[in-house]
Amino acid sequence: MAALIAGVVVAPTLTISTVTAAGELGAGGEYHPLTPARIFDSRPTSSINDVAPLGPKNQGPSDPTFDLQLLGLGGVPNSSSDVLAVSVSITVVHPTSIGYLSAYPTGAPGTSSLLNFAAGQTIPNLAIVRGGTGGKLTIAINGSKVGKADVLVDVLGWFSSSTYNAGTPGDLADERGARLVVVDPARIVDTRNGGGMPFPLGPGAQRTVQFRGASAAGTTIPNDPSVVGALINLTAVEPTADTFMAVVPDQPVGEPATSNLNISAGRVQANLVMVPVGADGAIHIYNSAGNTNFLVDVMAYLQTGADVESRKGRVIPLTSPYRSLDTRQVAWGGVPLGPAQAEDWSFAAFAGSVNIAGVAVGNQLALLGNLTNAGTARQSPNVSAEPGFLTVFPADAAAVPNISNLNTYELVPVPNMALIKYSAANQTVRVFNATGYAHYILDVSAVVLAD
């Protein structure tokens, strides 16, 4: 590995609302996993919720937008005073030209990207989104040409506010959700080389992955009913046909109504997934078409029963996504990361700037953000860049972990939401690039509190 470059991310003061100060958090920042449900589908063949103008949405250089109601759908409460943020999977379907999609609270500025896509490409990404004016989310489909694109939105769960009050009055155990337990990332399934499941997943088939009690590379998930959700990075590896994959808590009967990963034949692609754990302690992975190998990298689990006075594991969304890294810009060095190289970034200044009504939220152990490889460049002008990957992990790790956050291709932007754990010192992360020369971008959506 080449010498590491230390950098500091300096962020302006960030503001957050809805969550009160320490000691009064209650259910604030706790997660309530839901069985995945599709709450929006603009395709003409779908009868699921759409908004005017009906059908494929406008795409173009004028940043066309539409607004989507987040509250009261798919199991999310209807009251904005109860809901801090919502976890969704957003998919752009067959856009007519190259572009990118942004998602942000209605009424807030949209200055970041969630999805980058080529003409005709169907691609999803996970997002932690806050409702804006009227509890709505604004989606913008940007492109260099005027065109159209369909959009799908699947709700995965929601984060409660400190004022959330449901169930038995005064019974916090009944009102509260789950905390995010961030682990050292580890690969628990790799169908290519054994990995507990030594064969590809076939068409219309599902595979049961035992999550409670899973163990790999020193990371172990408790085998306990209090583990109610999983945060995993699912990677499909070279399917033999264009396909989609879905992760659900219960063994599917037929084709699931939601999707987590859409991928073209022969490609390698990842997507971060938040999913409830089923009563059997497992999650179930479905493949629609062809045969595909797949990887499951565990990033965290969701566990109930935390002390109400503790802060650890609460997820606090930012007012809107914040661009914390963009190595294309001089402010972050303007130099791509080379092959088999890594570099460090300290998020101490960023973490110190996150506040609620002017009061710092305190110690943080991780962030959730959209990581984008802006397109890998060649090592030699006459030799194509090999497909590769980016891995982001705590800078104090002894070695690069055997996981990946996203897979890279020459000159093709690739996004994926990432849970990034900080090192114990200076809240520093390390970015490793496998092949070619890579510029990358990180738009932060939320932070994870520590005690």
What positions do the PLM features span?
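Short edge beta-strands and adjacent beta->alpha junctions
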Residues: A2, G7, A11-D451
